[in-house]
Swiss-Prot record:
This protein is involved in the repair of mismatches in DNA. It is possible that it carries out the mismatch recognition step. This protein has a weak ATPase activity. GO terms for biological process: mismatch repair. This is DNA mismatch repair protein MutS. It comes from Limosilactobacillus reuteri (strain DSM 20016) (Lactobacillus reuteri). Transmembrane segments: none annotated.
Length: 881
C-alpha cells in the first residue's frame, strides 16, 4: 500500500528531486524548513534541533528550520563546508493563494557562486572556474559572480591547467566531460567541488560576452561557465563583463608550490593572511583595492613600461604626503563599488546598498580634486576619466531615505515628495491613524471609561478594548463584540470598521507602490552598470598605488631600477615581513651581487643562520619590484624575471602521500624543465632527503645542469661543503656564506652574507640551541673530534658535467658519479676508528642535578629580591659539592 503524504510534502518532494545534491531550504511562512535526510544532516552541521512532522504518524518526517531573517548565516556555514543550497521561495502571497501556495527554487547557491561575503572574505575574490579539454589543450574560464569579472585562457598540458586553477583558489570548477585523472585527483585532494553542466549555450547566444574572443575553445569554455550560472542563478547576469583572454606568459609565472614557500598570500603555519607579503603591503582603504592588490601579487608584470608606469605613480604619491593623506580620507568612505554594482544587476540590492552607493559616488569629485592638486602628468588621464555618476547619485539622493530598512517589500524606503500617489496614500495612513487617536479620546469621554483603548493586531485588525468591570458602561446596540479575553472584551463600531478599511487599503497600496518605485530606481541604476564597474576598477587601482606609497614610506623602501639584461645588484636588502615582525630589533641587511658573469650563488652556513631568509628576501624583492612597488633595500637593480621557482623548507605533500624527497625532486624537475635564462631559481638544501652520497651527487649534477644549460639566476644553499669546490670549475658560480662565530663556547649567528664558503657547520651548537640533552651533545662532540683527527672524508665529488647533457639524461650522470656500493663498515673505531654506538665513560646526570634543574625552572624571579637569589644559589652550590 502506497505511503500517504500531504500535498505540501508532495510539492516538496517534486522540488527536491530536481536538486538531489543540494540542501533544499523550503520556505514556510517566516521559516525555511529542511526535511528528511536534509534535516538529519543539516541539524548536525548547523547545530539545530531536529524534530519531526506528523508526530503521530508511524514514520514521522524529520525536520528542522531556521528563521528567514537569519538564513544567510546558515547558508554560509554549509557553503564553507563545500555543500550546495537550493532556495525554494513562496511565489505568491499565502493569504491570496487558492489552494497550495506556489513555490519554486529561485537560486542555487554553490561554493563558487556565493555572493554575500562578509568579514575578511569580503576582501577576497570568490572565483567560479570552468575547464574544458580537447587534444591535450585545456581552456579555462573564471568569474567572480559578485563583481562580474570574466577571464579565459588556454594551457598546453594538464599540470599547467591544475596550477592555474589552484592559483585562482577556486572552490568550484564546472566541467562538461571527462578530465584526465591528474586533474580530477587534484580536485579531490584540494576539496574543489566538481560540478557537471550537461547543456552548453551556443556562442551566438552569449556573443555579447565573447565578441572579443577569437579562440573557439575559449568561446566554448566561457559558454560552459555562463550556462552553469544561468542554470543555478535563474536571473539576469547583466553585470558580467566582456570576457578577456589572457596569456599566463604575459606575467611573471610563480607556481603554486613557490607561492606557498614564499608565503605570498597565506602563511605556511596557520594558512592565515598574517605574516604574508599581501598582509604587509595591504594599506588599502577599500575592499576592491585589497582584492586588486592580491591579483597584482598573483600576476607580477614582465613589461618594463607597465612596471615603470606604476612606479611613477607610486613615486608621485610618495612625494606628496598631504595629498596622499587627503586621498586616503576620501577612499575610506568608498564602499565596495564592485560588489554593489553586482547586487544592483543581480536584483538583490536593498535601500541601504543604494545609500552606500550614493555615499561612495559623492567622494569621487573630492578624489578628482586631490588628483588635480597633484598637478602630475602621470595622473592627468585618470583625473579626467573619473566619472562621479552625478545622475545616479542624484537619483538615489532624491528618492531613498538616509536610513532605510533592510527589507524593500515592507515600505519605509522612499522619501516623501518623490511620488505624488505615494504621498496621498501616506497622508491617508497618517491622517487615519490620527483619527484613531481622536476616536479613542472621544469614546472615553462618551462612555466615561478612562482606560478604554483602541489597538490593532494582524488577526482582528483595529479594536476597542474594555475591561470586564466597565462593560455595563457601554451603550447598547453600538458595539459589536470581536474577541473575549480573560479580563477584557474587544469590540468594533461601524465608524472604526470604515476607517480601518481606508487605513489598511492605503497601507497595502502604499507598500505595493513603494516596492514598484524601488524596482524602477534599481533598474535605472542597473542601466549604468558599465560606468560603475569602470569607476570601481579605477578607484581600486588608485587605492593599491597609495597603499604602495604608504608602505614604501613606512618601511623605507626604495624604487628599484629594472634592466633588460641579467644584472642583479641589491645593496642592503631586507626581508620585509621578517623585518616587520622584528619590531625594534635591528635587522641585518645583506647584498645580492650577481652581474652578467654570475648565475649561481652557492650558499653555505649553519642552520638557523638565515640562509632561507636570504633566499626568500630576494624572491620577494623581485615580486615587489615587478608589481610596481618599491623594495626593502638601500638600492636595487634587477632584471625582469619571467618565472620564479623555489624549493625552500620541508613542504611535504602529505595530502598526496609524497615524501619530502619526492616533492623536492618534483619541484626541482619543474624548475629545470621550465626555467629560462630570465628566471629566478631558489634551491634550499637539495638532496638532503636521501643518502649522503646520493644527495651530494644530485646536488652537484643539478648545479652543473643549471650552470651549463639553464643559466637562470640561482641561489643554491647546501650543507655539502664539498660542493664549494665547484667555484674552481664553474665560471659563473660564486661561493657565499652566512657567518657565525663562537663566543664563550656559545654560537652567535651574525646573519651576514659574505663572499667565500663557510669554514664550519656548527651543527652541534645548533642542536644545543634546540635543547638536546647535554650527555648527547658531549657524545656528539667526542665523535666529531675523533672524525676530525682521523680526517674522515666522503668520496671525491663527481667531475663537472659537460655539454653531453644534451644526449644523456641527468639520471645517467648521477648514476655515473655515484660511488660503488660496498659492504657497510664502522666509521671509526678506537684502534684507529670510532664505534658509533660504543659505550663511553661519562658522568651521568644525578638525581640532585635533576632536582636543582627543576627548582631553577620553577623559580619565580619576579617575586625575589637580589639577596633571595644569592641565598638560593648558595644552597645549590652546597648541594653540588
Amino acid at each position: 500500500m502506497a505511503k500517504k503524504t500531504t500535498p505540501m510534502m508532495e510539492q516538496y518532494q517534486k522540488v527536491k528531486d530536481q536538486y538531489p545534491d543540494a540542501f533544499l531550504f523550503y520556505r514556510l511562512g517566516d521559516f525555511y524548513e529542511l526535511f528528511n535526510d536534509d534535516a538529519v544532516k543539516g541539524a548536525q552541521l548547523l547545530e539545530l534541533t531536529l524534530t519531526t512532522r506528523n508526530h503521530s504518524a508511524k514514520n514521522p518526517i524529520p525536520m528542522c528550520g531556521v528563521p528567514h531573517r537569519a538564513v544567510n548565516n546558515y547558508i554560509d556555514i554549509l557553503i564553507d563546508k563545500g555543500y550546495k543550497v537550493a532556495i525554494c521561495e513562496q511565489m505568491e502571497d499565502p493569504k491570496k493563494a487558492k489552494g497550495m501556495v506556489k513555490r519554486a527554487v529561485t537560486r542555487l547557491i554553490t561554493p563558487g557562486t556565493q555572493m554575500d561575503l562578509n568579514g575578511e572574505q569580503a576582501r577576497d575574490n570568490n572565483y567560479l572556474a570552468a575547464i574544458s579539454g580537447q587534444n591535450g589543450v585545456f581552456s579555462i574560464a573564471y568569474t567572480d559572480l559578485s563583481t562580474g569579472e570574466l577571464k579565459t585562457t588556454s594551457l598546453n598540458n594538464a599540470n599547467d591547467a591544475v596550477n592555474e586553477l589552484v592559483n585562482l583558489q577556486s572552490k568550484e570548477v564546472v566541467v562538461d566531460g571527462e578530465l584526465p585523472v591528474e586533474i580530477t585527483t587534484q580536485f579531490k585532494q584540494r576539496n574543489i567541488l566538481q560540478s557537471h553542466q550537461p547543456t552548453v549555450l551556443k556562442n551566438a547566444e552569449i556573443s555579447y560576452l565573447t565578441q572579443d574572443l577569437d579562440d573557439q575553445a575559449q568561446q566554448h569554455v566561457v559558454a560552459l561557465l555562463v550556462s552553469y550560472l544561468l542554470t543555478t542563478q535563474k536571473r539576469s547576469l547583466a553585470h558580467m563583463q566582456k570576457a578577456i583572454a589572457y596569456q599566463p606568459s604575459s606575467f611573471m609565472k610563480i607556481d603554486h608550490y613557490s607561492k606557498t614557500n614564499l608565503e605570498l598570500m597565506r602563511n605556511m603555519r596557520s594558512g592565515k593572511r598574517q605574516g604574508t607579503l599581501a598582509w604587509l603591503l595591504d594599506e588599502t582603504k577599500t575592499a576592491m583595492g585589497s582584492r586588486l592588490l592580491k591579483r597584482w601579487i598573483d600576476r607580477p608584470l614582465i613589461n618594463q613600461n607597465a612596471i615603470s608606469e606604476r612606479q611613477d605613480k607610486v613615486q608621485e604619491l610618495l612625494d606628496h604626503y598631504f595629498e596622499r593623506s587627503n586621498l586616503q580620507q576620501e577612499l575610506i568612505k568608498v564602499y565596495d563599488l564592485e560588489r554593489l554594482a553586482g547586487r544592483v544587476a543581480y536584483g538583490s540590492v536593498n535601500g541601504r546598498d543604494l545609500i552606500q552607493l550614493k555615499t561612495s559616488l559623492k567622494q569621487v569629485p573630492k578624489i578628482k580634486y586631490v588628483l588635480e592638486t597633484l598637478d602630475s602628468p602621470v595622473f592627468e588621464e585618470l583625473q579626467k576619466q573619473l566619472d562621479p555618476l552625478d545622475d545616479v547619485a542624484d537619483l538615489i539622493d532624491q528618492s531613498i531615505i538616509e536610513e532605510p530598512p533592510i527589507a524593500v517589500t515592507e515600505g519605509g524606503v522612499i522619501k516623501d515628495g518623490y511620488n505624488d500617489q505615494l504621498d496621498q496614500y501616506r497622508d491617508a495612513m497618517n491622517n487615519g491613524k490620527q483619527w484613531i487617536v481622536d476616536l479613542q479620546e472621544h469614546e472615553r469621554k462618551l462612555t466615561g471609561i478612562n482606560n478604554l483603548k483602541i489597538g490593532y493586531n494582524h488577526v482582528f485588525g483595529y479594536y476597542i478594548e474594555v475591561t470586564k468591570v466597565n462593560l455595563d458602561k457601554l451603550p447598547k446596540d453600538r458595539y459589536e463584540r470581536k474577541q473575549t479575553l480573560v479580563n477584557a472584551e474587544r469590540f468594533s463600531t461601524p465608524e472604526l470598521k470604515e476607517k480601518e478599511a481606508l487605513i489598511m487599503g492605503a497601507q497595502e497600496k502604499s507598500t505595493a507602490l513603494e516596492y514598484d518605485i524601488f524596482v524602477k530606481i534599481r533598474e535605472q541604476v542597473k542601466g549604468q552598470i558599465t560606468r560603475l564597474q569602470k569607476l570601481a576598477q579605477q578607484l581600486a587601482e588608485l587605492d593599491v598605488l597609495q597603499s604602495f606609497a604608504v608602505v614604501s614610506e613606512d618601511y623605507h623602501f626604495v624604487r628599484p631600477e629594472m634592466n633588460t639584461g641579467h644584472v642583479l645588484k641589491i645593496k642592503d636588502g631586507r626581508h620585509p615581513v621578517v623585518e616587520k615582525f622584528m619590531g625594534h630589533q635591528e635587522y641585518v641587511p645583506n647584498d645580492v651581487l650577481m652581474g652578467e658573469d654570475t648565475d649561481i650563488l652557492l650558499i653555505t652556513g649553519p642552520n638557523m643562520s638565515g640562509k632561507s631568509t636570504y633566499m626568500r628576501q630576494l624572491a620577494l624583492i623581485a615580486v615587489m619590484a615587478q608589481i610596481g612597488c618599491f623594495v626593502p633595500a638601500k638600492s636595487a637593480e634587477l632584471p625582469i624575471f619571467d618565472q620564479v621557482f623555489t624549493r625552500i623548507g620541508a613542504a611535504d605533500d602529505l595530502i598526496s602521500g609524497e615524501s619530502t624527497f619526492m616533492v623536492e625532486m618534483m619541484e626541482a624537475n619543474n624548475a629545470l624543465t621550465h626555467a629560462t635564462d630570465r628566471s629566478l631559481i631558489l634551491f634550499d638544501e637539495i638532496g638532503r632527503g636521501t643518502a649522503t652520497y646520493d644527495g651530494m651527487a644530485l646536488a652537484q649534477a643539478i648545479i652543473e645542469y643549471v650552470h651549463q644549460h639553464v643559466r637562470a639566476k640561482t641561489l643554491f644553499s647546501t650543507h655539502y661543503h664539498e660542493l664549494t669546490a665547484l667555484e674552481n670549475s664553474l665560471a659563473r658560480l660564486k661561493n657565499v656564506h652566512v657567518g657565525a662565530t663562537e663566543k664563550d663556547g656559545e654560537l652567535v649567528f651574525l646573519h651576514k652574507v659574505s663572499a667565500g664558503p663557510a669554514d664550519k657547520s656548527y651543527g652541534i651548537h645548533v642542536a644545543k640551541l634546540a635543547g638536546m640533552p647535554s650527555s648527547l651533545l658531549k657524545r656528539a662532540d667526542t665523535i666529531l673530534q675523533k672524525l676530525e683527527q682521523k680526517d674522515v672524508k666522503l668520496p671525491n665529488t663527481p667531475k663537472p658535467a659537460t655539454d653531453n647533457y644534451h644526449t644523456e639524461p641527468i639520471s645517467a650522470k648521477i648514476n655515473e658519479a655515484a660511488p660503488v656500493k660496498k659492504e657497510a663498515a664502522p666509521v671509526v673505531e678506537d684502534n684507529g676508528q670510532l664505534e658509533l654506538f660504543a659505550t663511553q665513560p661519562e658522568k651521568k646526570e644525578s638525581s640532585v642535578d635533576r632536582r636543582i634543574l627543576h627548582q631553577l625552572k620553577e623559580l619565580n624571579l619576579m617575586g625575589m629580591t637580589p639577596m633571595d637569589v644569592m641565598n638560593q644559589i648558595y644552597k645549590w652550590q652546597q648541594k653540588l659539592k
